[in-house]
Amino acid sequence: LKIVYEDAYIIVVEKMQGLLSVNTERQKERTAYTILNEYVQRSGRQFRVFIVHRLDRDTSGLMMFAKDEKTQHTLREYWHDIVTDRRYVAVVAGEMEKDHGTVTSWLTDRTLYVSSSKYDDGGSKSVTHYHTIKRANGYSLMELDLETGRKNQIRVHMQDLGHPIIGDGRYGGEESLN
């Protein structure tokens, strides 16, 4: 983890791809949360970190941690007001037909995967806007802008479009670029 910003209330780190954000039932160690907490304890500081949000294991990007519970609560409560720009870049299989568009579906978290429905079946409504940056050699470079932030939303929506993210075996993507 690389610390990119720190003040009296928050720490922002750059999480690498392949690292879980937080502990799960099966993975208790070597998460962004545990690594940052170990760093704080080793440095002799008098606080611990509190989780504000998560990124998927296969997503790299910036993560924010609070230094106290009050800050954590405030950031979580107003997260959608504070974070107005949630854009991601991904390489997907196939050359996208459209330059831009929107995917809307209802996502339901199952045990091993997130399922998607075009109709409200009790899942959480999710909306992803996409823009095709470049097409080449059977792949597309995409900019993905989340209107909502559901678990595995981008992964599921790209699969729904028939263009799974490269490296995402769970949702149909190839292992790597050929």
Short names for language-model regions:
Residues 1-127, 134-135:
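RNA pseudouridine synthases
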Residues 11-12, 63, 129, 141-143, ...:
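Structured core elements
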Residues 28-36, 80, 137-178:
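Pseudouridine synthase
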Residues 91, 106, 131, 143-145, ...:
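Residue-level recognition of well-ordered beta-strand positions that form the cores
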